[in-house]
Amino acid sequence: MPELPEVETVRRTLQAKLPGLKITGVEVLLPKVIRSPELSEFKETIADKKILKVGRRGKYLLINLSEGYTLAVHLRMTGRLVYCAGQDPPARHTHVIFNLSNGCQLHFADMRQFGRIWLVPTDALDGLKGIKELGVEPLEELFTREFLKKELRRRHARIKPLLLDQTFIAGLGNIYADEALHRARINPERLATTLTPREIARLYRAIRDLLQEGIENRGTTVRDFIDGNGQAGNYQEFLQVYNREGKPCPRCGDKIAKKKVGGRSSYYCPTCQKVK
C-alpha cells in the first residue's frame, strides 16, 4: 500500500500539472470505485470544476476544486492516479478517466479494486469517516517527541501494530514502520509502555527522517507504486530490513527475520532488535 511518502510524491507530481485545469468530464468504468455521491450526481457535479490545489491528509489525496468541492482519493493497496496525454491508451485496470481542459487526462487505475473516490463539499471533508478519524501528521509541528512519549505511555499495545494505527499517526504503513523500528533498534513486539525515553527519542527521529528520505527519493516501489507521472520511486534501494528476509542486516550482519505481528508481516533483525 502506498504510504505517506508515496502519496506525497503523487501529490507533488500532480500539483505541478493540475492546478488551473478544468475537469470537462469523467468516464467511470468501474462504478464501485465511486463511494459518494451517487454516480450520476458525481458525473454531473464534477463537470467543469476547476482544479485549485492538490493536497494530502494521511494516505488520502485531496484535490480541491472550484465551487467548494474536494475530490478525495484513497489508493489503498494498488491504486494509481496518473496524469496522461489524451492520446495515451488507458493502462490495464483503469477504472476512472477524468478528461481535462488541456486535452490530457487523469487516470485512476487499481489492479485489486480496493481504491476509492469521494466527491464532497470541502467544508464537509473533515466529516468523511476515514479522514475525521486520522491521527497526527508525523511531519508536522504537532508531532513532537513529547507527544510521542505521552501517547506511548498511555497505549497498552505492541509498538508495531500501534504505528500502523491511522488514528494514532496518519500515513505510516508496513514499510516505514519496519524501517523505523530497525533504525531505532526496537523489536516490533515490544509493548509501547515499556519503551525507554532514549528508545522513544530514537523512534521519533527515525520516523521523521525515514519519511523525509522516502519523499526525497520519490517513494518506495516494491511492486506497484508509480507517481503521478507514471514513474517508479527509488527508496527501495535504501531499505534496511523490509522485504529482505534472510539477507544480512546492514548494521550487524545477522540475517533479517520475518514474522507476523498483529496480523501483518514484520521484518526485523534478531540481534539489533532484541526482545527485552
Swiss-Prot record:
Keyword terms, alphabetized: DNA damage, DNA repair, DNA-binding, Glycosidase, Hydrolase, Lyase, Metal-binding, Multifunctional enzyme, Zinc, Zinc-finger
Chain's role: Involved in base excision repair of DNA damaged by oxidation or by mutagenic agents. Acts as a DNA glycosylase that recognizes and removes damaged bases. Has a preference for oxidized purines, such as 7,8-dihydro-8-oxoguanine (8-oxoG). Has AP (apurinic/apyrimidinic) lyase activity and introduces nicks in the DNA strand. Cleaves the DNA backbone by beta-delta elimination to generate a single-strand break at the site of the removed base with both 3'- and 5'-phosphates.
Reaction it catalyzes: Hydrolysis of DNA containing ring-opened 7-methylguanine residues, releasing 2,6-diamino-4-hydroxy-5-(N-methyl)formamidopyrimidine; 2'-deoxyribonucleotide-(2'-deoxyribose 5'-phosphate)-2'-deoxyribonucleotide-DNA = a 3'-end 2'-deoxyribonucleotide-(2,3-dehydro-2,3-deoxyribose 5'-phosphate)-DNA + a 5'-end 5'-phospho-2'-deoxyribonucleoside-DNA + H(+)
HAMAP family named in the record: Fapy_DNA_glycosyl
Domain of life: Bacteria
UniProt-listed CDD domains: EcFpg-like_N
Quaternary data: Monomer.
Gene3D superfamilies (alphabetical): 1.10.8.50, MutM-like, N-terminal
Keyword presence, Lipid metabolism: no
The record's free-text note on cofactor binding: Binds 1 zinc ion per subunit.
Zinc finger region(s), FPG-type: 240-274
Entry GO MF terms: 8-oxo-7,8-dihydroguanine DNA N-glycosylase activity; class I DNA-(apurinic or apyrimidinic site) endonuclease activity; damaged DNA binding; zinc ion binding
UniProt GO BP: base-excision repair
Pfam families membership: Fapy_DNA_glyco, H2TH, zf-FPG_IleRS
Signal peptide positions on this chain: none
Requisite cofactors: Zn(2+)
The family this protein is said to belong to: Belongs to the FPG family.
Catalytic residues (UniProt): 2-3, 59, 264
Stated name of the protein: Formamidopyrimidine-DNA glycosylase
Chain sites annotated for binding DNA: 93, 112, 155
